[in-house]
């Protein structure tokens, strides 16, 4: 019996992933959720800084994912995300610079809106660095 379902991950810049998979684990705004074939229909927001884990042919692959929505249907899953990167695509120097900029903005203690934006930027930078560090030499 086939235990796969179709997954499509889209960003504004590219089709990040498309194919049949056995399972995914996605970081949503309420925590991580695992999806298998025949999951109940669901629409949920994606965390601003999280991971997408894809199981295909018994092997797991992990990616950085940021913001957007996931729609689970009977015929598959579609993820619309602001950004998605494989670990080898993450520019560590750029992520480190983004982390430092966000930390500086947090120290400046500006408006609440600027603080929230800086905090989100810091979370994204830290998650990108965490994922990259698992697969790249830092």
Curated annotation (Swiss-Prot):
UniProt-recorded Gene Ontology molecular function terms: ATP binding; proton-transporting ATP synthase activity, rotational mechanism
Membrane topology: Peripheral membrane protein
A Pfam entry, by short name: ATP-synt_DE_N
Gene Ontology cellular-component annotations: plasma membrane; proton-transporting ATP synthase complex
InterPro entries found in the cross-reference section: ATP_F1_dsu/esu_C_sf, ATP_synth_F1_dsu/esu, ATP_synth_F1_dsu/esu_N, ATP_synth_F1_esu_C, ATPsynth_dsu/esu_N
Record flagged with keyword Membrane: yes
Cellular localisation: Cell membrane
SUPFAM superfamilies registered for this protein in UniProt: Epsilon subunit of F1F0-ATP synthase C-terminal domain (SSF46604), Epsilon subunit of F1F0-ATP synthase N-terminal domain (SSF51344)
UniProt keyword annotations, A-Z: ATP synthesis, Cell membrane, CF(1), Hydrogen ion transport, Ion transport, Membrane, Transport
Lineage top rank: taxon: Bacteria
UniProt xrefs under PANTHER family: ATP SYNTHASE DELTA/EPSILON CHAIN, ATP SYNTHASE EPSILON CHAIN, CHLOROPLASTIC
Assembly: F-type ATPases have 2 components, CF(1) - the catalytic core - and CF(0) - the membrane proton channel. CF(1) has five subunits: alpha(3), beta(3), gamma(1), delta(1), epsilon(1). CF(0) has three main subunits: a, b and c.
Family: Belongs to the ATPase epsilon chain family.
Function according to Swiss-Prot or TrEMBL: Produces ATP from ADP in the presence of a proton gradient across the membrane.
Protein name: ATP synthase epsilon chain
Protein's gene: atpC
